[in-house]
Amino acid sequence: MSRLAWLALGAGCVLLAQLPVVPAFWISLANITGISAIVALGLVVLTGVGGMTSFGQASFMGFGAYTTAILTTSAGLSPWLTLPLSVAAALAAALVIGAVTLRLSGHYLALATIAWSVSLFYLAGVLDLTGRYDGIPAIPAVSLFGFSLADPRRFFGVIWVCVGIAVLSTRNLLDSRVGRAIRALRGGAMAGASCGAALIRARMLAFLYAAALAGLAGWLYAHLQRAVNPTPFGLPASIQYLLMAVLGGAGQIGGALLGAVLVTLANDRLQSWLPHLIGAQGNFETIVFGVLMVLVLQTAPDGLWPRLTRLLPRRRARSTPTLEASPLSRRDLPEPGSPLLRVAGLTRRFGGLVAVDSLDFYLTAGEIVGLIGPNGAGKSTTFNLLTGVDRASAGTITFRGEDLTGSDSPAIARRGIARSFQHVKL
């Protein structure tokens, strides 16, 4: 479908929701689905593309919700004024938490996000500012040009316009230069850094972007429900949002929307059916979601969206116009035979093992030189030291008169030193 067709479809859905023939139950469910989809879109960037698992997105949603709740009820600010403040609060929290948490990776990062998610939940439950576990009631409704949007049917359009904005911004981000750096975080971090990508910055940007979308979702949630308390922003909610991304397809924008629809519907039905089947009250749907996540990871690790798209008719490829691109600018090349790279006393120790010992060599521009040695001689370690993947225990590296000793991979790549790998890395 073309962009105009999608726009017409979206406008039609918004108008359809205003008709009284559509039951209020389905409008409420669609509103929750839209808010959940915004959070899941952040997880597409953070987890599906960036490879960083987070169980704390509901907490950032809570920052946005509580910010607007406090400012509209206590300070009397307009909800529209609190919208950027809610997103800013989530960003500020993500900046502080990310500065500490993003030093970790893999399951350590996931465990860290669980820890501060639980901590923030209990903190919100004991502070007078947040109304303790009772929360903050009587949040004013959003109004547009003097027209109140207190009715969920009227607020439907605001939510799904925000979903559309989130989809477009996510797609544009992933297609940008920053997006390519974020893609390099998953499985190709070393190769990306060696090509000049600032991956530490990319990790933080992905974390902040996901938090910003969660803050937006929190603002929408607060003015939809007109009350907030810690429960919707705890660890179980974060698990559900992660399940939405995984179930639909964590690396796909459409997967976030599909996952939000499926999990929201399943959650509503399971909360009604399971107590009758089991004969007891409890959050049994959490157990079902846990089992469902394991099954999806085993049977469809890429999610359901890629499988669904294979069943749909493919669009005919558009003809791409031929464009003449101007040549890229090139840096000044050194004169053949001029000094280029000088290594003096380069040493790398791993505890008591010396992998590289007092290596000295000198290269001039235009030379082709090979480094030859048996397995374990330190060839790969030498290349790692020269390209900033590893740091030398002693010695200096000078390139075109500039000391690069201790510089990281992106900085060295920007100076003009590139490398290849023994295994293919894209």
How should these model regions be labeled?
Residues 395-404, 414-415:
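Conserved ABC transporter NBD signature motif
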Residues 370, 415-425:
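ABC nucleotide-binding domain signature
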Residues 47, 369-374:
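The feature captures the beta-strand-to-loop junction immediately N-terminal to the Walker
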Residues 1-325:
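Transmembrane alpha-helices and adjacent helix-loop boundaries
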Residues 380-381:
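Conserved Walker
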Residues 387:
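Helix-to-loop junction immediately C-terminal to a conserved catalytic motif
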